[in-house]
Structure formats: C-alpha cells, structure tokens
Amino acid sequence: MKQILARRVVAEALGTAFLLAAVVGSGIMAERLAGANIALALLANTIATGAALLALILTFGPVSGAHFNPIVSLSSLLEKAINWKEFALYCCAQVIGAIAGVMLANTMFSLPVISLSRHSRGGVEQLLSEFVASFGLVMVIAGCVRYRWNAVAIAVAAYISAAYWFTPSTSFANPAVTIARSLSDTFTGIAPNNVFGFVVAQFLGGVAATVLFQWLIPKIKHE
C-alpha cells in the first residue's frame, strides 16, 4: 500500500514538473521568437501548454489520476476519492514538482535558476478571472469523471487552452503553478505579491464547482 502511494506521489511531482517546464519553457521560447507580437507568443504558449497537458494526463492518469493541481486534489478530497493524508502528500508533491519544473525551464534557456517575477497581475478583474478559470476547470473534470472518464484528458487540455484566451489572467487555475511561476521573470511569470490573491481565488472557485456538481450531477452509487 505504501509503495502504491509512493508511486502516485512521485507521478504527481514528475507530471507537475514537466507541465511547468512546458508552460514556462514555451513562454520563454515564444517571447524570443515572436518579438513584440504578444498575441503570437500567447498562441504558441497556449498550444504547447494544451499539448503537454493532454500528453501528461494520458501518461500519469492511470497512476495517480494526474491531478497536477491542489484544487483538483481538494475536489477529490471533498468527493471522498482521496483521504487527508493523500491530499497533503499530493499537494506537497505538486508544489515541489512545479518549482523544479520552473527551475529546469529557466536553466534550459540560460536564465538564472530562480528569478522573482516582476510581471504584475493585480486587480479585482484578475482575481475574478482566476475564480472563473478554476471553477470551470473543476466543472469540466467533475462532469467528465461522472460520465465520460476517458474524455478527461482532452477536455482538460481543451478547456485550459481556451481559458488562456477568455480570461485576462491567462488562466493559471492552479496554486502550485501560481507559486512556481513567481520564480521566473519571464513571459509566464507572476509577481510574488499577486500570488496569495490568485491562490485564494483558485481554491474558492474549485470548491464552489465541486459543491455545485455534487448537487447538479450526483455520482452514481453502485450497489
């Protein structure tokens, strides 16, 4: 049992690390190649992120569920799919993996391993967009898990890709991602003083979606 849990935790750390390497690395590459064309840079970053998400969920889903995100793990806890110990270990693994992924991306592009971001993302509209993005992410997962489990990977990748464009914050929707991206002063970074507000909005959005879907689409109980 301990070995199985250890594998799940390592899968969460490894998957989150590769996700952040893809997000931050593609952001750096996109900004360098696109020059001053921010729309083109964001499009490239979106495609890379969506593709990485799809691949990583398909890879690690059978091992750990491929949460890569504390709000997804909290939703699973509220749904009684995991327990408190598993939740705590998942969250620790996700944050550690996310930071490692950012450090890797910075290093691969010959940047300081850690550089605090100066990219300000303050304002009520940014917090609202993170609430909406996080609510939508958990909404998509909750709906697919109940009736279309095999569609989770493509649905999540598609949703996050879309949310990059319909939210002014470009849809962080992940506390581990938010914390880690504050350590890269690049295209996808976030100033450290904006992190707390983002994380609170993300958790509120995730919990709200979980509670709503427990009523809207109750899980089928197998006799």
Functional labels for PLM-detected ranges:
Residues 1-223:
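Membrane-interface helix-loop junctions and terminal tails of multi-pass membrane proteins
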